[in-house]
Design a protein with these regions (language model features):
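Core subunits and conserved enzymes of cellular information-processing
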Residues: 2-231
Length: 231
């Protein structure tokens, strides 16, 4: 496999991963059972304002990118210019990613409010939640495995873990808990009830990581073959 073919295939798989990830995250919100922790703040704000969810996700991603840049400038490790260039490239990726989410948001109805009959029922909504978690896990695995540009949500966790010298998994838990706490505060402060946090939030916290592990275990050979540089 030539270097050019290798790069093209990695970009195609990365793009496929982004598309699947956007579907999973959007589908999660449409079940009305609770969104993933890191997106709970933009989701709650979108419900309290007239700003669309994808637009607020983009703003949240820009904030994550800014945090990464500040951390990398502070740490001054490795080729800082190269690292900062990669950080900034996340803005373009985030813009494309959130536009894909916007398309899905237009096409997919809110199941318990905009659908009828079986599509409103709890079993169907849980089925869609499971599908959302599977899509989120597969999409995240594909984008991470291609080693191109990190999703800002993953990138900020990695940067914070590096700053505080803790395992990425532990830092991810702290970030998730912080997002949930902020969402609960904003919800109660401005509406008097919980927005965006539910059983789906807890299932997503546990389930997405498991899906990533299973996917990488099943497709390790085929995925790694795309990442190898020719000898």
């Amino acid at each position: 496999m030539t270097i050019r073919c290798n790069i093209i295939r990695r970009i195609l798989l990365y793009s496929l991963g982004m598309t699947i990830l956007a579907l999973g995250l959007t589908l999660n919100t449409k079940t009305n059972l609770g969104v993933s922790p890191i997106l709970s703040i933009p989701y709650a704000l979108s419900e309290m304002t007239s700003i669309s969810f994808p637009d607020l996700v983009f703003l949240a991603y820009c904030l994550f990118i800014l945090i990464q840049i500040l951390i990398h400038i502070h740490l001054k490790q490795g080729d800082t210019k190269h690292i900062l260039a990669i950080d900034c490239s996340q803005i373009l990726v985030s813009m494309i990613f959130t536009r894909i989410m916007a398309l899905y948001s237009m096409w997919i109805p809110i199941f318990d409010l905009e659908c009828t009959s079986f599509f409103q029922t709890m079993p169907f909504r849980f089925l869609m939640l499971i599908l959302a978690i599977v899509c989120t896990g597969i999409g995240a695995a594909l984008t991470l495995d291609m080693k191109l540009i990190a999703n800002p949500g993953d990138g900020v966790v990695a940067a914070l873990a590096q700053l505080f010298k803790m395992p990425v998994g532990t830092c991810k838990n702290y970030v998730d808990i912080s997002c949930v706490m902020i969402t609960l505060f904003l919800s109660y402060q401005f509406t008097g009830h919980i927005i965006g946090i539910g059983i789906g939030t807890l299932i997503a916290m546990i389930g997405v990581g498991r899906v990533i592990n299973v996917f990488n275990h099943l497709f390790t050979f085929s995925i790694s073959s795309f990442k190898k540089e020719p000898v």
